[in-house]
Amino acid sequence: MNPLRTLCVMACLLAVAMGNPQSGNRSGRRSNSLDNVEQPSNWVNPREVEELPNLKEVTLKKLQEMSLEEGATLLDKLYHLSQFNHVFKPDYTPEPSQIRGYIVGERGQKIEFNLNTLVEKVKRQQKFGDDEVTIFIQGLPETNTQVQKATRKLVQAYQQRYNLQPYETTDYSNEEQSQRSSSEEQQTQRRKQNGEQDDTKTGDLIVIQLGNAIEDFEQYATLNIERLGEIIGNRLVELTNTVNVPQEIIHLIGSGPAAHVAGVAGRQFTRQTGHKLRRITALDPTKIYGKPEERLTGLARGDADFVDAIHTSAYGMGTSQRLANVDFFPNGPSTGVPGADNVVEATMRATRYFAESVRPGNERNFPSVAASSYQEYKQNKGYGKRGYMGIATDFDLQGDYILQVNSKSPFGRSTPAQKQTGYHQVHQPWRQSSSNQGSRRQ
C-alpha cells in the first residue's frame, strides 16, 4: 500500500474525530485568495485518500491525458496530504554523471556533457563567455512531447538571438520538421521583409537536462533541491574561477522544479564567492513536496541581483507563492492559461512565453501591469509602473504583474498594457475574481 496513503488516511480520520465542522467543504478551492489557506482535512476525506494512485503510477503522460481540472485536483491532493509530518523526504539526488546536457555550438551542434565534465567541455570552446552566458536547467523529462517542444522553442530562440546556426534537421522528428514554419518563424520573416533590424547579440547557451533524470512522480516529489542546487552552484563557481566567466553576464533559467534548483545554485554561488549572479528566471516554479525539516528551501528573491518568475499554472503543477522580485501571472493566478488543455501543457507555457520574448524583435511582446487580481487588471484598476514579461523585464520592477495572453502562438499581444488608475503596492493579497475560471487554493 502507498505509505503516503496509509499515513494520510490516519491523519484524515483524526481530523474527523476531532469534529472539524468544515470537513469536506470545498467551496474555497476556486478562490485565488491566499488568505486563510484551508487545511487538507477540511476538504479531503479518507475515501478520497484511499483512491489516490501509487506515486510511481503518476506520470506526465497520465497527467497529460487528464483534463486541466482533473490533473490539478490530483496534484492538489498529493501536495496538501504530503505536508502531514513531512511524508516526502527530499532524498532523490541523481549522480552528477547521470545529469546530462549540452552546449549549443557556433554551428548549432550539440556539444554534450554531464555535470562532471561540464567545465572541461566549456574550456574547449573558443570565446566562451565573451558576452552573455545563458544556462537553462530543464525540470521535466523531454520524453514528454510538450516538454520537448517547449525546450526546442527556447533553444531555437536563443540560436536566433545569439546568431548561432540552427540544428540540423535530423535532430527533429518529421512532425517537428513540419512545424518549423510556425507563426513565430513567419513573424520573424515578415519583420525581415519589412527591413526591421534584429536586436541580436552574441552569447553562449548551456542546457542542463535535469528533468531527464526524473522518471516518475515519486522522484519528482522527493527531488533533493538543496543538494542539486549546491552541485550546480559549485559548477558555476568553477566556470568563473577557471574559465573566467564573469558572474555579471550569467543568466540562470530554471523550469518547474529546476527553478528552485536554480535558486539554491545562486545562493551556493554567493556562499562560495561573495558575489551574486546577475539574474535568475523561474519558469512556472513548482510546489515543493519534499522539504527539509527546519530549513527553508527553494527559490527566493535575493538569490541573484534580480529574480523574476512567470506563473502559468499557479494552482496546477506550479505555485501561487510570490518567490521573486517580480512575479508575472498571465491571465491572473489560475490553474492554467488560455489554450492549455492539461497541467503539463499549462506549466510548459511559461517556457513557451519566455522563448517567444527571446526571439529578436519580440522582446516586448508581453506588456503587463501591476495588479492584485485579474479582475482588477480588466477593470483598469491596477497600480504603478507597466513592464514587460520575458527577456526584456526591467530590473527595477517589483511585485505582482498581470497580463493577457493569446491561446495560440504568437502568445504575446504586443500592444501596450491597459492604462491603470490605482496606486503602486508590492505583493498585495490576491483579490478574488469571479471570472477567473479554474483557479484554486494552494
Curated annotation (Swiss-Prot):
Residue ranges with Polar residues bias: 34-44
PTM per Swiss-Prot/TrEMBL: Tyrosine sulfation occurs in the female only and plays an essential functional role.
Deletion consequences: Viable, even in combination with null mutations in Yp1 and Yp3.
Subcellular location per the Swiss-Prot or TrEMBL entry: Secreted
SUPFAM superfamilies: alpha/beta-Hydrolases (SSF53474)
In-chain residues carrying the UniProt-annotated modification Sulfotyrosine: Y172
Signal peptide segment: 1-19
A GO cellular component annotation in the UniProt record: extracellular space
InterPro entries: AB_hydrolase_fold (IPR029058), Lipase (IPR013818), TAG_lipase (IPR000734)
Keyword entries, A-Z: Phosphoprotein, Secreted, Signal, Sulfation
Gene Ontology molecular function: serine hydrolase activity
GO biological process: lipid catabolic process; sex differentiation
Residues modified to Phosphothreonine: T170
Induction: By beta-ecdysone; in males.
Reported tissue expression: Synthesized in the fat body and ovarian follicle cells and accumulate in the oocyte.
Compositionally biased residues, Low complexity: 21-33, 175-186, 431-442
Ranges for region Disordered: 21-44, 165-200, 408-442
PANTHER family for the chain: FI01450P-RELATED (PTHR11610:SF149), LIPASE (PTHR11610)
Family listed: Belongs to the AB hydrolase superfamily. Lipase family.
Function: Vitellogenin is the major yolk protein of eggs where it is used as a food source during embryogenesis. Vitellogenins and their receptor yl/yolkless are required for maintenance of microtubule plus-end orientation towards the posterior pole of oocytes. Involved in polarized localization of germ plasm components, such as osk mRNA and vas protein, to the oocyte posterior cortex. Receptor-mediated endocytosis by yl/yolkless is crucial for actin reorganization, mediated by osk isoform A/Long, required to anchor germ plasm components to the oocyte cortex.
Protein name: Vitellogenin-2
Organism: Drosophila melanogaster (Fruit fly)
